[in-house]
UniProtKB/Swiss-Prot annotation:
This protein's record includes keyword ATP-binding: no
UniProt entry tagged with the keyword Repeat: yes
Annotated Gene Ontology cellular component terms: cytosol; early endosome; early endosome lumen; early endosome membrane; endosome membrane; late endosome; late endosome lumen; late endosome membrane
Start and end residues of each BEACH domain: 229-463
InterPro entries on file: BEACH_dom (IPR000409), BEACH_dom_sf (IPR036372), WD40/YVTN_repeat-like_dom_sf (IPR015943), WD40_repeat_dom_sf (IPR036322), WD40_rpt (IPR001680)
Lineage, top ranks: Eukaryota, Metazoa, Ecdysozoa, Nematoda, Chromadorea
Cited Pfam families: Beach, WD40
Phenotype of gene-disrupted mutants: Coelomocytes contain larger early and late endosomes enriched with PtdIns3P. Delayed conversion of early endosomes to late endosomes with early endosomes retaining PtdInsP3 for a longer duration of time which may possibly be due to a delay in either the turnover or transport of PtdIns3P out of the endosome. This leads to continuous fusion of early endosomes which continues until rab-5 is displaced and rab-7 is recruited. Double knockout with sorf-1 results in a similar phenotype as the individual single sorf-2 knockout.
Family as reported in the entry's similarity comment: Belongs to the WD repeat WDR81 family.
SMART domains: Beach, WD40
Cell compartment(s), UniProt: Early endosome; Late endosome; Cytoplasm
Name of the protein in question: Suppressor of organelle fusion 2
């Protein structure tokens, strides 16, 4: 039965019972085609029956019984012990009761052949690990059967790396995990289960959702008892006092940091202690990491100067680990991690070479495992040890002895400070050149499970000297100062005995009765609070989890790091005598006590539904791709959609959940289509960036046809912006055009054409058509021919499998040319062909061979698309000489290497087909005049290869050894000669041959049957009408140009006069040419591309949508207009006008979702495409006085900043909330806000005040970072040029460049006052002194200075907007006119 039909039901449970009787714990448990996960435990004599019985009591708890008998009350009250319970364990019955309580199916095969099977419908509890069945094959064993392999990560691992997983102690994340824990408690309490929570029993899903294995405490009782781990300070004291060896202490430190042997990315780390140069010396410096010793301080400082700033990537990389273990690791692992190609000679052969080569630290195997020297690979020699030892065993003993050497012992604490200690802290690591990448890596995708773990926050104590004198107490004093005393005494607070007859004693007795009555519930509540404390204090636990005493000690030591509401809750852990909430009210009590926001409570509830549905699908209990499975997917997607709308600060959860759906073959398409709109509106930019790679991988999938649809692509382009879309998403869409899947190729082609029209000709030429040209070669990568026969037999009948796919790409390019202009052919298509041929000529490669075939298709397309006049201008010098003749010289020269002779022959066939198409197009006379070179080359080559004897038999000609001509097969020569002889006749064909007699054997059989058209074609040239083609019926009839006719140079800007086949004007063609030819964008030629008319008064502000095909304008006539950029029109009216403003519009900006914010004193946020008003906000002040909102500026995708003319504060508006979210005070002194600018998503905000003060603050928290005093009291605009440089523009003063680091100072003054300024990615555009346009690079270097003439723009320029993708400028004037100029 196929996997698709598997569904968990009673019949499957019966089938499973048959399999279990023969299953062994180490075997794979496979039910039909589904692999299940199972684990088995046995009860034996050494099992602690009492401890096991306690764990069962917690699961089968009956203490919460209001009808508790009176005798038990009296026993508790009088302190009489309850009668001892029987230790006999009713094993199978208890498991059956557990299964019934948790709705788990139960199988009992212990009394074979009789079986008891109890099927339960699967009930998913989102915070509990799902179990399909509990089974017994013997009377003393138990088997737990799970569904899909667990996706979760050990929760302790997540907490160890909390610096990345819970950055900066994120209170929202802590609240979310706490809510998970409270929901779990409620789920268990409703089933009367009193679990004692431990972090080791939790797993954390990638979406930060906690799952608890409720049966894990029972299974722990079957494992061999593990020696309790001693506290870290005690272990440190043992090492310092020489009770422990260095090896034992390093093993302990690696253990508590979660490093496990065998894990490639998380293996234990030991130090290299010597360089193996001598037997008793050569010790390394332990106060520096091996990476620093290997790379040097200069390189580490240079790495710190780059982003992200760090010194050490990792102390033990996967490459280093695999190289160390190269002799014992399988070859597949080595090729996966080290190098794909297996080259055993590249691996270090000796220990000294290993030490010199590696920048990584050592591994413990070099101190305890001699087998690591013996190679399991026949082609790799054993690892050689130093000469002063004779065997691997002796080396291990010697190396271990070196590790325990006194020189190492007295300096090991320095190495521990670098690897486990205080030098890992950010501030200390900068001075020690020890800042690790894992601490500064931003926007990491998913939960971190590897990296450094800091155990000590103080310098590590040194080891007791070997010759320590007890009379000298200096060492003990040092140890006390470090906090590692030799003894520790705990003072006990004196207990106050209450008065015997006091009400307090009576109350305490009542509490004692109640506490003991519900002791298991009380312990469960305490353990839940201990887990919460470990979440809050994860960075300070030093790897010691589930230790109640250590947790309480850390709460006391780091109380200042604990949020106040959690601090009050943790008071219950120190005073257990105080009133605890009732067990049924615990979750509500903690939620209220912690003041968990309602948003997080609602989000957790909705997200829990999504997790439950996802778990249900992944348990393999429902057939995938079935109707039921599709229904569950729809519900899961809808739950995730609601969660995204509620997520606010819990983006990590929804991003991880969305990634899981993207990686799910069944759910990915529906998820993307349904969630993309809400993701665009809700998530931050950093969260969206995490989704880029999964979405690109999904688009690249051959089955994802729907994701190439234009509706989805529109959402993606809006979501990520045009720059990111063109750079990252467009290439895989273009690649889809070359897919062998016809549906995928057709949809991709249509979408690309839609994008080409949407973005316009300039962007199309720079990004779209250039990529389409490159992808054509991929159609021919295999050089497979149509049919079973793969060897070409006829020159003009070679058809490749990629021809059909390439024809679709060809039609796409043709449509682009038809839509815009032949300029695309003359400045892009043909130069691309020439460039590719030149690359092959310089260095032939297998990768470029398919490109030669694509070149022929591009040339053929160009010939069909160009007019007669255009073709003849580019024919001889360009198409014939630089393409066809150049390719033939390569093909007919044997010194150029091809992957095979078959490939070379196929390419020769294709170039002959192209040459034939050209001759059909231009006719015989034009062929003789302009296209004779390829024919002369071919026939001269043929005559040098072959010769004829007196009997007209064709033989190979004897050639000198230095002759490098390729030996063209005889059948190819016959085909070529026969084809052209039939069409032109032998006399005309012989004009291309130096030795016409060579043709006689090839045409002797066909000359007698020459057709009449051939005889006409071979008439003397005088019989032709002047400039006439002749009687050719195929192709256009062209006029022949004389040899003296001028041919336009290919380097001209696209032929401004060759635009008759498209809709573009000559000026637009010039812009396309400049863009393709890579002409510097820093130019202004005073060319007007388009006029926009509609405003009646001054243009205040211009803003463009990221794709630059639409823009908006704000005017003093109280309107905001939406415009489209249409290259085919010279004058355009507005698309839509927003008319709800009642005063002149001051400012305007466009949000990431293309909604528009404009202000006339009141903030209006509206959607121009749905023509709806989204929000309208006035400036409401706490003082009661309003004011006019004068400026608005984007902070990030969803947040706007606004300033008012009557206040000195900045307000933030969140488009997701639809209102003000906070108000930031920008200066402690007087002064009103005048201008504002934002950089780096709110990290830096600069606000200019009326008193000349410039305030620089962080918009995320409102912190003022700097205040600078300038002379600008009437500032009209402020613009960030770089991280530390600003342009301040004043209405009366000249603009100034202001440097803010280290102290604010003026770098440079501009020549004139700046009336308008706009910043792009790499340039600053300004309008100065009314009519002067100046463009500066970000460094401040002047690039353009020109004057806008009155005949170019009526009125005075008042607003400017550069369009960098289109290499043009929008300029607005005081008369309301707008011009698109270049």
């Amino acid at each position: 039965m196929p996997e698709e039909e598997f569904e968990w039901n009673e019949s499957k449970l019966n089938a499973l019972s048959e399999i279990l009787t023969q299953w062994a714990p180490h075997d794979e448990l496979k039910l039909e085609n589904v692999i299940l996960e199972a684990k088995m435990a046995w009860i034996h004599e050494s099992t602690d029956a009492v401890a096991l019985e306690k764990e069962f009591e917690k699961l089968l708890n009956t203490s919460f019984d209001p009808l508790m008998d009176y005798e038990e009350h009296q026993r508790v009250k009088n302190g009489v012990c309850s009668p001892a319970k029987s230790t006999k364990l009713d094993w199978i019955t208890k498991w059956a009761n557990i299964a019934e309580k948790l709705s788990i199916s139960h199988i009992n095969c212990s009394k074979a052949p009789h079986k008891t099977i109890n099927f339960q419908r699967l009930q998913i509890l989102p915070n509990m690990t799902s179990i399909l069945a509990i089974a017994h094959t013997e009377a003393d064993n138990v088997i737990l059967i799970y569904g899909h392999t667990k996706e979760g990560i050990d929760f302790q691992t997540v907490l160890r790396h909390s610096y990345s997983n819970i950055p900066d102690g994120s209170l929202q994340t802590i609240h979310f995990l706490t809510k998970n824990l409270l929901d779990l408690y409620s789920q268990l309490f409703s089933r009367k289960i009193t679990a004692e929570f431990k972090t080791r029993h939790f797993r954390c899903l990638p979406s930060f959702w906690l799952q608890y294995d409720v049966l894990a405490p029972i299974f722990e009782q079957f494992r061999a008892p593990r020696a309790p781990r001693i506290p870290l300070d005690e272990a440190t004291s043992n090492w310092a006092n020489r009770k422990w060896e260095n090896y034992q202490y390093l093993t302990y430190l690696n253990d508590i940091t979660g490093r496990v042997r065998g894990e490639v990315h998380n293996h234990p780390i030991f130090p290299w202690v010597c360089d193996f140069s001598e037997e008793n010396g050569g010790f390394r410096q332990l106060n520096r990491t091996k990476y620093r010793l290997c790379k040097g301080d200069d390189q580490l400082r240079e790495m710190y100067s780059r982003e992200p700033s760090h010194h050490v990537p990792e102390l033990l990389s996967d490459i280093g680990y695999m190289v160390y273990r190269a002799r014992v690791e399988p070859k597949d692992n080595l090729c996966r991690h080290v190098r794909r190609k297996w080259v055993p000679e590249e691996y270090p052969s000796t220990m000294s070479r290993m030490y010199q080569w590696t920048p990584d630290e050592c591994i413990p195997e070099f101190y305890d495992d001699p087998s690591i020297f013996n190679s399991c690979h026949p082609d790799m020699a054993d690892l050689r040890f130093p000469e002063f030892v004779s065997s691997p065993q002796e080396f291990i003993e010697w190396h271990r002895k070196m590790l325990e050497h006194e020189e190492v012992s007295m300096n090991l604490h320095r190495w521990i400070d670098l690897v486990f200690g205080f030098n890992l802290a950010i501030d200390n690591s900068k001075n020690a050149l020890n800042l690790h990448l894992c601490f500064v890596e931003k926007n990491r995708r998913g939960l971190r499970t590897t990296g450094m773990v800091q155990l000590f926050n103080r310098p590590h104590p040194i080891r007791m000297p070997l010759n320590y004198d007890p009379k000298l107490d200096n060492y003990h004093l040092k140890m006390e100062s470090f906090g590692f005393g030799m003894t520790s005494e705990h003072r006990k607070e004196p207990e106050v005995e209450p008065d015997e007859d006091s009400h307090y004693q009576i109350y305490q007795k009542i509490k004692k009765v109640r506490r003991l009555r519900h002791n298991t519930y009380f312990s469960s509540m305490v353990s839940a609070m201990e887990v919460m404390a470990q979440i809050v204090l994860a960075p300070h636990l030093a790897g010691r989890f589930d230790d109640p005493d250590h947790i309480r000690r850390c709460i006391q030591l780091y109380s200042y790091r604990i949020p106040a509401n959690y601090r009050r809750l943790f008071d219950f852990l120190f005073n257990t005598e105080q009133d605890f909430p009732d067990c049924d009210e615990f979750s509500f009590f903690v939620s209220v006590r912690l003041n968990i926001p309602t948003k997080i409570l609602n989000f957790s509830e909705e997200f829990g539904k999504c997790v439950s549905l996802h778990i249900l699908r992944k348990l393999d209990v429902i057939p995938p791709f079935s109707k039921r499975s599709q229904l569950i997917i729809l519900k899961e997607v809808e739950s995730l959609k609601k969660s995204i709308r509620l997520c606010d600060h819990m983006e990590q959860c929804v991003v991880a959940a969305f990634q899981q759906l993207l990686e799910d073959e069944e759910a990915c398409i529906q998820s993307v289509h349904r969630l993309m709109p809400v993701i665009t509106r809700s998530l931050s930019q950093s969260a969206l960036e995490d989704l880029i790679n999964p979405m690109i991988e999904l688009i690249q999938c051959e089955t994802s046809v729907k994701l190439l649809d234009r509706r989805f692509l529109m959402h993606v382009s809006i979501c990520y912006g045009t720059h990111t879309f063109l750079d990252l998403f467009l290439p895989p869409i273009v690649e889809a055009c070359a897919s062998m899947n016809c549906d995928r190729s057709v949809v991709a082609k249509e979408s690309i054409m839609w994008l080409a029209k949407r973005y316009g000709p300039v962007i199309c030429a720079k990004f779209i058509s250039s990529n389409v040209l490159r992808i054509m070669a991929s159609c021919y990568e295999a050089f497979e021919m149509v049919g079973l026969e793969q060897q070409p037999k006829a020159v003009f009948n070679v058809v490749l499998q990629g021809d059909e796919t390439c024809s679709r790409i060809e039609s796409l390019l043709s449509e682009i040319v038809l839509t815009y202009s032949v300029t695309f052919i003359t400045v892009q298509f043909l130069p691309f062909c020439v460039d590719l041929i030149e690359q092959f000529h310089k260095r032939s490669s297998v990768q470029l061979e398919p490109g030669l075939v694509s070149v022929f298709r591009i040339v053929e397309l160009s010939i069909r698309s160009m007019s007669d006049h255009q073709l003849m201008n580019y024919l001889e010098e360009f198409i014939i000489q630089k393409v066809i003749y150049r390719v033939l010289t390569i093909l007919l020269d044997a010194s150029f290497q091809f992957s095979s002779m078959r490939v070379r022959i196929i390419i020769i066939c294709k170039v002959c087909q192209l040459l034939h198409s050209i001759t059909q197009k231009i006719g015989t006379e034009n062929t003789r005049i302009y296209a004779n070179q390829p024919f002369k080359l071919m026939f001269s080559t043929f005559s040098e290869i072959y010769e004829t004897d007196e009997e007209l038999r064709i033989n190979l000609r004897k050639r000198p050894s230095e002759n490098t001509l390729f030996e063209v097969p005889l059948w190819m020569v016959e085909d070529v000669v026969d084809k052209f002889a039939k069409e032109w006749g032998v006399p005309f064909l012989s004009s291309f041959c130096d030795d016409p007699a060579f043709l006689i054997p090839f045409v002797s059989n066909s000359s007698s049957s020459s057709s009449p058209p051939a005889s006409i074609a071979h008439s003397p040239p005088s019989a032709f009408t002047a400039y006439s083609l002749g009687g050719m019926s195929s192709g256009n009839r062209l006029f022949s140009l004389s040899a003296s006719s001028p041919v336009n140079s290919v380097n001209s800007l696209g032929g401004l006069s060759f635009c008759d086949s498209g809709s573009l004007s000559a000026v637009w063609c010039a812009r396309v040419s400049a863009a393709v030819c890579g002409v510097d964008n820093y130019r202004f030629d005073h060319l007007s591309l388009c006029n926009y008319t509609g405003h009646q008064e001054k243009i205040r502000k211009l803003a463009a949508i990221s794709n630059e095909n639409s823009f908006v304008s704000a005017s003093s006539d109280k309107t905001v207009k939406l415009w489209s950029i249409k290259p085919e029109l010279d004058e355009i009216g507005c698309q839509w006008t927003y008319q709800k403003h009642t005063r002149p519009v001051h400012d305007i900006t466009i949000l990431a979702d293309n909604s528009i914010a404009s202000t006339d004193g009141v903030l209006h946020v509206w959607d121009p495409f749905r023509t709806t008003l989204l929000a309208q906000m006035e400036w409401d002040s706490k003082e009661g006085s309003g004011g006019n909102i004068m400026r608005v500026e984007n902070v990030d995708r969803h947040i706007l900043s606004a300033i008012c003319s009557l206040h000195s504060t900045v307000k933030l508006f969140d488009s997701r909330v639809g209102g003000w979210t906070c108000e930031l005070k920008v200066s402690p002194g007087p002064g009103l806000t005048r201008a504002i600018t934002v950089r780096d998503k709110g990290n830096k905000m600069a606000v200019a005040l009326s008193n000349g003060t410039l305030a620089i603050l962080d918009a995320r928290n409102g912190k003022i970072n700097a205040l600078a005093q300038t002379n600008s009291t009437h500032t009209v605009s402020v613009n960030w040029l770089s991280d530390t440089r600003l342009l301040v523009c004043d209405a009366d003063e000249c603009g100034i460049f202001l440097e803010t680091n280290p102290r604010a100072h003026i770098v440079r003054k501009l020549q004139d006052p700046v009336s308008a300024a706009c910043l792009t990615d790499n340039s600053l555009v300004t309008l100065q002194n009314g009519t002067i346009l100046r463009v500066y690079r970000n460094s401040g270097e002047l690039q353009i200075e020109t004057k806008i003439r009155p005949d170019e723009l009526p009125g005075t320029p008042t607003a400017v907007l550069p369009l960098p993708l289109n290499c043009s400028y929008l300029i607005g004037s005081s008369h309301g006119a707008i011009r698109l100029m270049c």
